[in-house]
């Protein structure tokens, strides 16, 4: 193990901005999350909220997607910012983009991610139990990972979160460790399958993803999909009588809002 120094002027500017944020908040409990958010779904949101409750400042290291079907980095940064701005306390979350840095490109080495978090002064690192390369196993019913020794040697707490699912019996997002119902009640947040739906132009149900996130993704991968989008919008949805141009993103958001309506006979 050791320190990682990235010689990149853009990264250096981001680091300076981070330290200013840390100083302004007088943050002592700083937690790191490293993910590709490809795509950003409700289980990620649950992880965010759990982390924010226990930290003065959360650093989100956004890494490149490692598979050919992955979303563009700028697109991911766009919907991540939109989500944080709308649904989380943005002053307590710092996005640290790791764009075009091959060292973290595959999001496969949690040890490197731990060193990165420690080098920035983080006191905790949160990872999911399904993180590739974590090497998780149980010894006397206690979870063990390859990061256990690193955590002790470098004085950074590593928290391994269990898998989050939506339970149709509990009617909420739960961890697989806390839910008493079987897997036949669980909806899983599988990133690859959600991407396949979006790539096919199918809107994932709101239980999987926020409408703002789905709208940004669909409007990006299907630009100008509807030649007469304005007419479709005006013909289907309520308006204030003033003809206003609606973007693809606004159209998808309105469509998703309508999907969530309940129909009463």
How does the language model describe each region?
Residues 127:
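Short beta-strand and adjacent tight-turn residues that come in two discontinuous sequence segments
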Residues 1-108, 114-123, 132-265:
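Non-catalytic terminal extensions that flank enzyme cores
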């Amino acid at each position: 193990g050791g320190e990682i120094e990235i010689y990149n002027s853009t990264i250096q500017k981001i680091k300076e901005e981070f330290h200013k944020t840390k100083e302004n908040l007088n943050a002592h409990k700083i937690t790191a999350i490293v993910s590709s958010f490809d795509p950003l779904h409700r289980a990620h949101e649950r992880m965010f909220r759990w982390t924010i409750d226990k930290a003065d400042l959360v650093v989100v290291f956004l890494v490149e997607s490692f598979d050919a079907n992955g979303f563009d980095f700028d697109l991911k940064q766009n919907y991540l910012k939109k989500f944080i701005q709308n649904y989380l306390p943005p002053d307590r979350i710092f996005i640290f983009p790791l764009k075009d840095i091959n060292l973290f490109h595959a999001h496969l080495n949690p040890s490197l991610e731990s060193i990165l978090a420690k080098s920035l002064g983080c006191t905790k690192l949160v990872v999911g139990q399904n993180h590739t390369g974590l090497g998780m196993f149980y010894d006397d019913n206690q979870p063990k990972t390859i990061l256990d020794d690193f955590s002790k040697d470098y004085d950074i707490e590593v928290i391994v979160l269990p898998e989050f699912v939506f339970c149709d019996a509990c009617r909420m997002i739960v961890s697989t460790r806390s839910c008493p119902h079987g897997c036949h009640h669980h909806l899983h947040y599988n990133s690859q399958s959600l991407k396949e739906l979006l790539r096919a132009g199918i809107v994932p149900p709101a239980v999987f993803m926020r409408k703002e996130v789905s709208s940004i993704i669909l409007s990006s991968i299907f630009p100008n999909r509807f030649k007469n989008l304005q007419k479709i919008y005006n013909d289907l949805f309520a308006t204030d009588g003033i003809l206003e141009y609606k973007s693809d993103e606004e159209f998808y958001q309105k469509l998703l809002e309508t999907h969530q309506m309940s129909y009463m006979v």
